[in-house]
Amino acid sequence: MSNSNTPRKFSEKIAILERKQNEENTTFEDIMRQVQSITHHPTDSSGSSTATAPMPIPQQGLLPPQQPWGHNLGGSLPNVHQMPSYSPPQWPPNWQHEIQHRPIQGHRSRSPEDHMIGSASGSPSHHYHPYGMRSNGLSRSPDRTPPQHPQYTPYGPPYNQPGQLVPPESWNQINRARSDPAIHNMGGMVPMHPHHHQQQQMAFHQMPHYLQNSMPGPSGMMAPNSQSQQHSPQLTPQGSQQGSPVQMHHQIPPPLQMGNNQQMGGGNNGMSPLQSPNHMMTPMYGYHNGSPLHSPMDSPHASTLMLDGSGTPSPYMEVSPPGMHDFNQDAGSLPNLQNVQQQQQQQQEIYTNGGAPGGGYYHAPIGPRHSTGACGPRLVPGPALTPESQSAPTSPHNQLDPNQPPMWPTRTFSNSPEALDIPKLTITNAEGAPGHHVDSYNDFNDLGLDSLDSVLCNGAPPQTISNHQTPNNSFHDPGGTQMLQN
């Protein structure tokens, strides 16, 4: 009995589903027929056309009036099988001329007010859409219009070349963000005294190979083949590569430079050679009379200047041999501090006495291209170069006396716990009295911390425990145990 009832139930369900599907198909066909009549013949039914006024596609404007698929854009999808092919629309030859003479097309705006003004006929405006039709239904909004005239170039001539490629000679005409012009003038050095070039070209070939190979390449300041720019210490920078024309010094201070060892601005560009552990230093030459002769910013080799009594370089200036400045022959080795002190004393005599007529060499050490800021103490405190030397305008060492010995700062800003101000800590119980309530320190008994046993077990105040003479704000006693004291 059950076997005979099961197929009948399924057949009834199948019949019900088929009936519902037929009804839905009939309803869908009726709706599609109405939509097709509205979209294909908008003027036949007046009632439906008023309800769907924004749907018709404008036949004037950019779209050609007669297209095989143009009438289907606003309604249902076209029948693919009835279309011959998807050929691109053939624009009329004078479409730009028609757009040019169209009223209210010169501006590009998305505001509804401009669209209301642009409607030639006084028809009421419908809902605004930036990419939709005008209120009169004749053309698109100005945002969808092509250029106003055939010679219209929205971004200038460089962007309208064939293939949208810009020739190199017109790169500077592109209206885009430009970087600092000092970047492009970094390599521009003008030699002041060309008669010293022959003497300095000879020294470049005498330099070690690692110094010759360490010359900055195209990305650096100077190219190795332009020897007249490499070996002349009388080079004045161009442009604003050092911040200002008056501030003629390297803006990046060398590594280990502190205290009164200041950067020299203007005519006093002298620096102490004892500012770097390996003496890798930018060569700076200072003069009393503000001579415009300056060294290249990143010259990888050092030079020697002979100063006469007036403070200007004498015509018998030579380049010192590279061995005198080759402090880095042993990699990682510290410099000879005695030679450094002698050079520093000679340098001080030159600047304080005005320079000896026949002697007094200033040895500028080798300088790195990239150096960090003042981050640590010097190896040996040296005397100041000149009493009238001043640092950069933005340097924090403006108010320091150049002749005073370097004073180590009492307050440091490092993260090491030795230099931090540690507050006083006292172990107390809930009543405020020091006692044996700190159960969290019971684990320290296994470590053999005898200084905490009396606190944990006997409840003695911390004053009786701290019998070692230790300074305040410290956790460390001479016994090597960690203890808390008041």
UniProtKB/Swiss-Prot annotation:
Knockout consequences: RNAi-mediated knock-down results in increased lifespan.
InterPro entries: TORC (IPR024786), TORC_N (IPR024783)
Disulphide-bonded residues: none
Subcellular location: Nucleus; Cytoplasm, Cytosol
Origin: domain of life: Eukaryota
GO biological process: cellular response to cAMP; determination of adult lifespan; positive regulation of transcription by RNA polymerase II; protein homotetramerization
Transmembrane region(s): none
Subunit record text: Interacts with crh-1.
Function field: Transcriptional coactivator for crh-1, the homolog of vertebrate transcription factor CREB1. Regulates the transcription of metabolic genes and may have a role in mitochondrial dynamics and metabolism. Involved in modulation of lifespan. Through crh-1, counteracts the pro-lifespan-extension signals of AMPK both cell autonomously and, when expressed in neurons, at a systemic level, possibly using the catecholamine analog, octopamine, as a messenger.
Family per similarity comment: Belongs to the TORC family.
Protein name per Swiss-Prot or TrEMBL: CREB-regulated transcription coactivator 1 homolog
